C-alpha cells in the first residue's frame, strides 16, 4: 500500500457497512423550494426500524449503495444525497409508515420523466429491507416543471380547435376492439360520429395487426371523420393509435395522420414508455395534433395498496411528459376509482394550483406554473343512466367515453350515439337551470327519453346494469 493511500485511509475512509439512518435520516432538514419531494408508504421487514427503512429508501433512490465506497470522498454527499426528513405511522395499519424524502434537483436530467422515475422508483423497490414500498405522491418543484413542454395543447386550445364549449365532450371506443376489417371499423366510426359523438377511439391494443393494418385503418377513419363533419356541421375526431414497436414507426404514423388532416392521435404511454411519449408530444405540438393518452398497464403498477405507485403520480408524470387527454377512471362504471381520490388526481391533471389535501390523497401542494392542463377521460362500463353522475362529478372539462354504452344500443351505433348526446345535453341543461343532478338524475333522464326514442331504448336496455365491488384504495 502506498504512503498516500495509507494517509487517505487513516484520516477519512473506513470500509464496511453502516446504518443508512446515520447518513440519510435527517429529521431536522428544512426542504427547499427546488427539492423534489416524495411520500412513500413503507412496510419494513420485521426488526427493521422505520427510520432505517425510510433512510434506506432515500439512499437507494439517490446516492447510496450497500457499503461505504472510496469514491464517496470525491464528491459532496451532503449536496447530492436524498434525505428522509419525516416518518409518520399509517393510521389503522400495523408496521406501515409514510416516509417523506427530499431529493436535490441536481440529481435529475432536465425535461426527462424517464430519468426522474429511474431514480425515484428504480431499484429501491426490490430492496430486501422492505416488505413493500409504494410511492403515494410527488411534489414537482416549479423550477423542474419549467424544463418540460407538457401537454401539446391543453384544455383551452383543444376547445378552440373543436369550437365546443360549456359541456363535457363525448367519445366512444370502437368494439369489438380486435378483429374488424379497416372498412367495417371505419363504418362504425362514421355511424357514431354522425349520431352526435365528438370523438371515437381506437382501443389501446389496436396497433397494426394482420386483420387491420394501421395505414388502412387511418384512411377509412379519416373518411368517416370528414363525411360525418360534412353531415353534422361539427368538428369530429377519432383517436388514431400511433403506438408502435419503435419510436421511428410511431412518429411515421403520426406524420401520416397529420397529412390526412385529422385532429388527434393516441398513445399508450406506459407500455410505449415515457421517452416515446414525450417525443410524440413534442411532435404533436409542433404539428397541430391533439394527443389522447391511454393508461394501459397502469393497474400493474398502481392497484396494490401497499406496493407500487399510486395513479396520481402517473398522472403528474403524464402532465409533464405530455398528453391532452388521459383515462382517469369513472367512480361509477366497471373500472376502479373511489370518488374523492379520483377527484384529487383529476384536479392535479386540470388545475394550475392544487392545495395539499390528505383526505383526497394529495400529500403536497402542487403549483403547475401555467403548464397546460389535461382533460380526464371517464370510460369503462358506463351508460346513459350514469350521465347525471358523470356530469356532476367530472364537470365540463372532461371526456365521457361510452364504448359498449354506444355500440350496444339495440338499434345500432348511430342511435346509441344519439342516446348519449341527448342524455348529456339534458343533464347539462338541467345543471345550468340549477337542478340537483345527484338527486334528480334519473328523473332528468326519464324526462328526456320522452322526446328521444333512442334514449328511451337505451334506458330500457341498461336499467339493471350495475358494477358494485368494494374499492381497492
Swiss-Prot record:
The modification N-acetylproline is found at residue 3. Binds 1 Mg(2+) ion per subunit. The modification N6,N6,N6-trimethyllysine is found at residue 14. The keyword Ribosomal protein does not apply. The record marks 334 as: Transition state stabilizer. It catalyses: 2 (2R)-3-phosphoglycerate + 2 H(+) = D-ribulose 1,5-bisphosphate + CO2 + H2O; D-ribulose 1,5-bisphosphate + O2 = 2-phosphoglycolate + (2R)-3-phosphoglycerate + 2 H(+). The disulfide bond which can form in the large chain dimeric partners within the hexadecamer appears to be associated with oxidative stress and protein turnover. GO terms for biological process: photorespiration; reductive pentose-phosphate cycle. RuBisCO catalyzes two reactions: the carboxylation of D-ribulose 1,5-bisphosphate, the primary event in carbon dioxide fixation, as well as the oxidative fragmentation of the pentose substrate in the photorespiration process. Both reactions occur simultaneously and in competition at the same active site. This is Ribulose bisphosphate carboxylase large chain. The gene is rbcL.
Amino acid at each position: 500500500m502506498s504512503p498516500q493511500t495509507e494517509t487517505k485511509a487513516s484520516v477519512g475512509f473506513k470500509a464496511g457497512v453502516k446504518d443508512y439512518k446515520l447518513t440519510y435520516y435527517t429529521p431536522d432538514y428544512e426542504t427547499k423550494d427546488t427539492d423534489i419531494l416524495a411520500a412513500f408508504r413503507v412496510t419494513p421487514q420485521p426488526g427493521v426500524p422505520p427510520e432505517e427503512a425510510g433512510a434506506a429508501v432515500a439512499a437507494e433512490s439517490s446516492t447510496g449503495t450497500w457499503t461505504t465506497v472510496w469514491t464517496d470522498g470525491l464528491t459532496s454527499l451532503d449536496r447530492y444525497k436524498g434525505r428522509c426528513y419525516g416518518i409518520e405511522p399509517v393510521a389503522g395499519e400495523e408496521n406501515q409508515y409514510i416516509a417523506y424524502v427530499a431529493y436535490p434537483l441536481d440529481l435529475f436530467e432536465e425535461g426527462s420523466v424517464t430519468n426522474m422515475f429511474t431514480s425515484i422508483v428504480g431499484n429501491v423497490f426490490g430492496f430486501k429491507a422492505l416488505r413493500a414500498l409504494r410511492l403515494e405522491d410527488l411534489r414537482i418543484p416549479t423550477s423542474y416543471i419549467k424544463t418540460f413542454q407538457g401537454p401539446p395543447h391543453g384544455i383551452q386550445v383543444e376547445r378552440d380547435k373543436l369550437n365546443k364549449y360549456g359541456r363535457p365532450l363525448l367519445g366512444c371506443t370502437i368494439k369489438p376492439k380486435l378483429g374488424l376489417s379497416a372498412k367495417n371499423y371505419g363504418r362504425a366510426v362514421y355511424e357514431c360520429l354522425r349520431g352526435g359523438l365528438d370523438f371515437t377511439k381506437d382501443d389501446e391494443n389496436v396497433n397494426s395487426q394482420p386483420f387491420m393494418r394501421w395505414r388502412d385503418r387511418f384512411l377509412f377513419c379519416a373518411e368517416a371523420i370528414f363525411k360525418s363533419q360534412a353531415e353534422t356541421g361539427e368538428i369530429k375526431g377519432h383517436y388514431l393509435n400511433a403506438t408502435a414497436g419503435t419510436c421511428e414507426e410511431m412518429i411515421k404514423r403520426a406524420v401520416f395522420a397529420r397529412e390526412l388532416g385529422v385532429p388527434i392521435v393516441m398513445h399508450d404511454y406506459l407500455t410505449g414508455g415515457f421517452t416515446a411519449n414525450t417525443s410524440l408530444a413534442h411532435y404533436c405540438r409542433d404539428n397541430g395534433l391533439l394527443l389522447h393518452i391511454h393508461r394501459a398497464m397502469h393497474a400493474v403498477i398502481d392497484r396494490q395498496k401497499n406496493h407500487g405507485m399510486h395513479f396520481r403520480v402517473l398522472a403528474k408524470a403524464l402532465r409533464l411528459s405530455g398528453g391532452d387527454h388521459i383515462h382517469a377512471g369513472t367512480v361509477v362504471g366497471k373500472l376502479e376509482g373511489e370518488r374523492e381520490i379520483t377527484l384529487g388526481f383529476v384536479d392535479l391533471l386540470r388545475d394550475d394550483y392544487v392545495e395539499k389535501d390528505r383526505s383526497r390523497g394529495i400529500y403536497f401542494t402542487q403549483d403547475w406554473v401555467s403548464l397546460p392542463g389535461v382533460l380526464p377521460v371517464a370510460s369503462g362500463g358506463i351508460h346513459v343512466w350514469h350521465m347525471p353522475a358523470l356530469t356532476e362529478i367530472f364537470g365540463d372539462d372532461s371526456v365521457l367515453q361510452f364504448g359498449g354504452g354506444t355500440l350496444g344500443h339495440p338499434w345500432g351505433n348511430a342511435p346509441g350515439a344519439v342516446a348519449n348526446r341527448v342524455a348529456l345535453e339534458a343533464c347539462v341543461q338541467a345543471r345550468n337551470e340549477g337542478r340537483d343532478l345527484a338527486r334528480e338524475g334519473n328523473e332528468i333522464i326519464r324526462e328526456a327519453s320522452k322526446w328521444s326514442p333512442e334514449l328511451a331504448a337505451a334506458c330500457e336496455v341498461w336499467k339493471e346494469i350495475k358494477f358494485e365491488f368494494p374499492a381497492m384504495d
